[in-house]
Amino acid sequence: MSFVPYSLPELPYDYDALEPVISSEIMILHHQKHHQIYINNLNAALKRLDAAETQQNLNELIALEPALRFNGGGHINHSLFWETLAPIDQGGGQPPKHELLSLIERFWGTMDNFLKKLIEVAAGVQGSGWAWLGFCPAKQELVLQATANQDPLEPLTGKLPLLGVDVWEHAYYLQYKNVRMDYLKAFPQIINWGHIENRFSEIISSK
């Protein structure tokens, strides 16, 4: 086996740190079970891919694409998701500053209006998926966009993800039941804008 298997990243906070917005029960299941399953399935697909490449089995290589896209996307999306959240008493919900705030105000007028639009995009996801704040390097602009299932933003659109809102039911159902909007309205309280600003600065400086 020539590939290095992926592993579950540690959370930068305790499982109960995002309460009352997200319960510890949800966080444990979401991280230890759901994210881990994506990683397990991704590694299994990569092992098959490694064998298929060795055997030059083109049919198998093509057949593996859906599993790589779904489980690889699940790992990419969740790894970013954990990093862009923070407990309320550790800066969660504190608005961004500097260039990122200026760009948000340029495209959406105010921070409050941006959050309203973000919630609208997330609420509009049919079934399971993600709502994203992304940066388009080609146009040097911020965008709000949804992706279905576990489709990752960057490989499919060329836009770089800054913030992702998980609107799969496993992200909220145990606490909010079928009222997705209550989850979305509470979500801005735990956005880690400090981390997102750092990520944005790294993107800008590398282009």
UniProtKB/Swiss-Prot annotation:
Classification via PANTHER family: SUPEROXIDE DISMUTASE 2, SUPEROXIDE DISMUTASE [MN], MITOCHONDRIAL
Family to which this protein belongs: Belongs to the iron/manganese superoxide dismutase family.
Function as written in the Swiss-Prot or TrEMBL entry: Destroys superoxide anion radicals which are normally produced within the cells and which are toxic to biological systems.
Cofactors: Mn(2+)
Gene3D superfamilies: Fe,Mn superoxide dismutase (SOD) domain, Iron/manganese superoxide dismutase, C-terminal domain
Annotated Mn(2+) binding sites: H30, H78, D166, H170
Subunit structure: Homodimer.
Protein name: Superoxide dismutase [Mn]
Enzyme type, top EC level: oxidoreductase
InterPro entries the record matches: Fe/Mn_Superoxide_Dismutase, Mn/Fe_SOD, Mn/Fe_SOD_BS, Mn/Fe_SOD_C, Mn/Fe_SOD_N, Mn/Fe_SOD_N_sf, SOD_C_sf
Pfam families: Sod_Fe_C (PF02777), Sod_Fe_N (PF00081)
Documented EC number(s): 1.15.1.1
Catalytic activity: 2 superoxide + 2 H(+) = H2O2 + O2
Record key words, sorted: Manganese, Metal-binding, Oxidoreductase
UniProt cross-references to PROSITE patterns, sorted A to Z: SOD_MN
Co-factor binding details: Binds 1 Mn(2+) ion per subunit.
GO molecular function: manganese ion binding; superoxide dismutase activity
